[in-house]
């Protein structure tokens, strides 16, 4: 073997080593998933390197790369797409072109991205909104919100809430031809967090007379108190969303102070005065038995009250919807929840399903045995189309 052949062989082995990740047997299209993961891993590694050099914040590097995937608000043969502002928050509105004798459904969608990255303009979210508007014959509002690290909680929550309240005004609904009795909210990941949080907040808002008919939460992040759930342990290094990245997202939501991130990773961020909150996220009593699988529940390690005083957001129900008491949950609308087996956020969704059902809320739970975080969003994968079809069919029947 010549030098050139040997060199190519070594390079090929290194590339294969970088790309290859062992995956469960029931996961479809494993090599396509590995390629996508290698792309994301490369971005993450570059972002880490740039941050170490002091040139750019880690999340800002992610945003720069993501901006190349943004598309303009362009109408097509089926859907009219416009970009406007709802209460100073930039949104995209998708309206079917075909005539309708009746008022249409309305769906308010919130993108994911760990409260730090993402946009309604990303091609995947744009395409999802088009499909939903066309197939559901619905007006879809896809909202933006200000992002960390420049903006921290509660800014993201407030932006989404203010845009939603604007949409729920009678004259706005009339402008877009939306039936005020058929409005729903949806979001994925951090967007699912925000969807759950603002839906709870609406229950206490006397100024909003129009109520949501449904909420649809796609692998939502619902609490930062316990980041050592069975799903975190099982999927800490799974594709697309690792434990270290998720904890970084959570901490950046509240502050750029990395001490919160370190405390979260060691489970020493919750002060003993807030110990009563753990009953809302106690997986030993809230997870179905088959998801516990021999995991042993350990009592929390309490930290000092200093972090909670500096950054109280991580104990705030508006950031952690699982911390809502049963009286609040009891008033929530019909709910659809997607959870994925190979997702570290799986148990957040499972616990929310249990708590909602325990308070009498009607819940449709779609647990995806071959699913993973991002399965709904990577539109080049077969599983994404399957989940979107199931999602839209549920909306057709219930919204």
Swiss-Prot record:
Listed EC numbers: 3.1.1.3
Name of protein: Arylacetamide deacetylase
Catalytic activity: a triacylglycerol + H2O = a diacylglycerol + a fatty acid + H(+)
Compartments (UniProt record): Endoplasmic reticulum membrane; Microsome membrane
GO cellular component: endoplasmic reticulum membrane
Residue intervals passing through the bilayer: 6-23
UniProt note on tissues of expression: Detected in liver (at protein level). Mainly expressed in liver, small intestine, colon, adrenal gland and bladder.
GO MF terms held by the record: catalytic activity; deacetylase activity; lipase activity; serine hydrolase activity; triacylglycerol lipase activity
PTM field: Glycosylation is required for enzyme activity.
UniProt similarity note: Belongs to the 'GDXG' lipolytic enzyme family.
GO biological process terms on file: lipid metabolic process; positive regulation of triglyceride catabolic process; xenobiotic metabolic process
Cysteine disulfide partners in this protein: 116-340
Misc: Can hydrolyze a number of clinical drugs such as flutamide, an antiandrogen drug used for the treatment of prostate cancer; phenacetin, an analgesic antipyretic which has been withdrawn from the market due to its links with renal failure; and rifamycins which have been used as antituberculosis drugs.
Residues in the Lumenal compartment per record: 24-399
Result for mutant: residue 282 to Q: Abolishes glycosylation at this site and causes substantial decrease in activity and reduced substrate affinity
Regions of this protein lying in the Cytoplasmic compartment: 1-5
Catalytic residues in the record: 189, 343, 373
Membrane topology according to the record: Single-pass type II membrane protein
Pfam families: Abhydrolase_3
Keywords from the named record: Disulfide bond, Endoplasmic reticulum, Glycoprotein, Hydrolase, Lipid metabolism, Membrane, Microsome, Signal-anchor, Transmembrane, Transmembrane helix
Up-regulation conditions: Down-regulated following infection with hepatis C virus which results in impaired triacylglycerol lipolysis and impaired assembly of very low density lipoproteins. This may represent a cellular adaptation to infection that is aimed at limiting viral production.
Main location: endoplasmic reticulum
Role noted for this protein: Displays cellular triglyceride lipase activity in liver, increases the levels of intracellular fatty acids derived from the hydrolysis of newly formed triglyceride stores and plays a role in very low-density lipoprotein assembly. Displays serine esterase activity in liver. Deacetylates a variety of arylacetamide substrates, including xenobiotic compounds and procarcinogens, converting them to the primary arylamide compounds and increasing their toxicity.
Glycosylation sites (chain numbering): 78, 282
UniProt short sequence motif Involved in the stabilization of the negatively charged intermediate by the formation of the oxyanion hole, positions renumbered to this chain: 111-113
